[in-house]
Amino acid sequence: AHIWLTDDNGSPLIGEYSMPTRLGSTELKSFNHSVWIPTDHNTGKLTGTRLHVPIRFEKEIDRLTPYLFRAVCQGRVLKEAVIKMYKINEAGIEVEYFNIILENVKITQISPVLFPVGIASKHMEEVEIRYESIEWKYTDGNIMFKDSWNERVIA
């Protein structure tokens, strides 16, 4: 997976990836996110509306790192983050198949991570982000769903 970020002024924050189809992105080494809805443990009935857990990912420390620290330290809201996921198709070609588009993104935590010698050769960082809206898009068939905190959802 790769991420592209746009700052609060609408300018791209350029990552170090230089492959033409991923130019300016940053590779995500790990990614974790979930959405859940509260339910009664005995009956299974819904007791509230959906809740989004912050997105957490791990990436190599790179040219984006100071921009991410600036965003968290100054409370800046990034205009957009786009995460694109890839897979190998039946013909053996790598293709983009899933996107996550986030709007009004807040960097809420950055933690540099240094692994013991021999476990990883790169210096890494864990990043946590929150957002105002999220859209999930499966590219084959253009199947998508968008959720926004500004829209009231009744369970």
PLM regions and their residue ranges:
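Glycine-rich, low-complexity intrinsically disordered segments
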Residues: 1-155
